[in-house]
Amino acid sequence: MPTPGTGSVPELQLVPFQLGHFPILQRWFATEKELVQWAGPALRHPLSLEQMHEDLAESRRRPPLRLLWSACRDDQVIGHCQLLFDRRNGVVRLARIVLAPSARGQGLGLPMLEALLAEAFADADIERVELNVYDWNAAARHLYRRAGFREEGLRRSATRVGRERWNVVLMGLLRQEWAAGGAGND
């Protein structure tokens, strides 16, 4: 089981998500498209704490089904990310990864992702980490490839946002690839 708060890199530390972080997170999504890009189609704009109750409940189970993290720099919340556990199969899904608009473009995406991967693989039973990303999100796909993820498949027309249909790319990283420093597959 990952130890909360151990995933840190220079200038950035992951800390367990607290209810006091929610108002900060909520401000980062001005439109439905921004919210769906982050959370998938399950949540509705505007984001409300009530919508996150299921995530929070899953984080309180023993063992937790989900861990919610805030990324902090200089005691300021500048990001959010989650781990979803499929312990039976030794798989973790990275989910709901976002940096504050003011923190983007500063090279913080990879350190946050590396800290999150360290948390995921701290559990010796985890063999695989995977994620979904929309195919049009070239910056995120590039970041994930830099961290060692490989594109493994495409779910066409998987998400509806208004009148648009978005394709979803499945990406995965195995423990041995991560341990070997799988970064640089871009």
Curated annotation (Swiss-Prot):
UniProt keyword Transferase present: yes
Binding site for CoA: Q37, I97, V98, L99, G105, N137, H142, L143, Y144
Keywords: Acyltransferase, Transferase
EC number, as in UniProt: 2.3.1.-
Domain of life: Bacteria
Residue ranges occupied by any N-acetyltransferase domain in the UniProt entry: 12-176
Subunit record text: Homodimer.
Name of the protein in its database record: Acetyltransferase PA2578
Biological classification of the source: Bacteria, Pseudomonadati, Pseudomonadota, Gammaproteobacteria, Pseudomonadales
